[in-house]
Amino acid sequence: MPKLKVKAGKGKKGKRKKAGKNEHRLDKESEVERARSNAALWEARLKVTEFSRVEYRDAARSLAQNNEDLTKQQYKLEKDMVEVIGFLKKQDLEKDELIEKLQQNLIAQKKSAQDEREKLVELYSKQIAHLEENYSQKTNEMQIIQSEFKLMREFRRQKVELEKELDEVKESLWRANQDHKETLARMERRFFEEKQRLEKEAEKKIMMLAEKAHSEAIIQLDEARKSVFKENVRLKEAFSYHLKEMKDIKKSKKMQEDAKLHLLQEKETNDLLVQEKVSQVSQKKVQIQELQQNVKALECALERMTMEMEKDAQGKEHQALLQEQAGNVELQKLQKVLHMKEREMNRIKKLARNILEERTEVESFFLEALWQVKQEIATSRNYYRQVAQSAYTSKMIQASLGKDQYPKIRTFHNKEHSTNDVSHDLSEAEKWTHIQAGKVDIGDLTWEQKEKVLRLLFAKMNGFQSRKSPGLKPSPPADVSSIKEKEINTSNLEEKPEESSSTFITQSIPELPAPSLVLPHIQTGRCQVTG
């Protein structure tokens, strides 16, 4: 009896082992299917992003082209504006020069009018003086006559006549004086009126000033010069009229000669065209006869071809009916296959949705871990900087007291040209020189190295292939669930700085302050982290 019990127990254990193997196999198959669906999903996302990138590039190119066209148009408009402004300035300068010339002419006319007025005044003053001299002489003569022939009868007889003559002379002198005054006043009034009129006309019609001044000069000339000038003007007009008639006659003669040559050429061309048309008509008659014969032959061939085409059409209709029936059968098959594919795609979509929901939980876990590591890096870096600065100041104080030697100069502000800065010590925390080849515990790593491990795991989970450094051979990372307990290979940890920012595609990390490096111990290359 005891032997039977033992055998029964062994059979149960074997069944349990087989069931465990089957479950393990099913888990592996489900993981493979998940990986495939994940890969297909990310390929679809990659295609969508690539398509959107091409569209953005085309849009940017079109915007750049539009910007270039607008720049060229603006340059052209500015150039045209500059040319127009230059042309207007040139016209203004020409108008200013013309105004200046007219003003000079006006000044010259005024000066000439003033000279003529002075000459007239001088002339009339001379005439008045001469008349006064004559009057004085006559008066003296009359006095002499009166004194000498006072007693003479003849003087008495002539006295009345002489008095009359004297009155007439006085009256003539008075009239001459009045006429002179009137003419002088009229000339002055005319001069002022003419001056005002010239000033107004110079403001309104500058171009007509020369003609008016010319006409005034003609009025003030004497009759002989005026007649000569008028005759000169008339001859000039007649000469210009005859020249114009001569030119018109020459033009009409030339036009008639050209028309004659043109008519002769047209006659020659018409004769040639008539000859060509006659020859063409004869050729056309021959061609018409040949074409009529060809038409008859083609009609016969067309009748034969129509009969053959009707036979071919009947055969093709029968063949098309057969192909249509076969196509309907094939279409029904394809519809069934399409329905099956749609059902399969729906199942794949549900599976992908479930996978994404599971991945979001893992992503949030790793993002929280990354944020915590960055916080630890920042606190460790600040703590080391404070400790190093206090140690440096204490050494400087001791050296100033003569108890110890002066230390090397050290900076704490991460300057560009500093040779001994705290950041140089902090950069040692990212190096892997203190780790030997083989396996190492995750607790032996610095916070910076832990951050790189997490980012490398992100890249591996998202399907990215990181660029390894040539110094270490690559090896697969450890399991994510036991990352804080198990050991990982250090060859997977060395990567370039640009890959340290890898993260999930489905999520975005908020911008945090740039993480500082944790201070490594200079002798051992290990991190000294304090809580």
Swiss-Prot record:
Domain of life, per lineage: Eukaryota
Entry keyword annotation includes Transmembrane: no
Any one GO cellular component localisation term in the record: cytoplasm
Subcellular location: Cytoplasm, Cytoskeleton, Cilium basal body
Positions with biased composition (Basic residues): 1-19
Basic and acidic residues composition-biased segments: 20-32, 482-499
BP GO annotations: motile cilium assembly
Free-text disruption phenotype from the record: Cilia in multiciliate cells are motile but fail to produce flow. Multiciliated cells are present in the normal number, cilia of normal length and of normal density. They are however misoriented.
Official protein name in the record: Basal body-orientation factor 1
The organism's taxonomic lineage, starting at the top: Eukaryota, Metazoa, Chordata, Craniata, Vertebrata
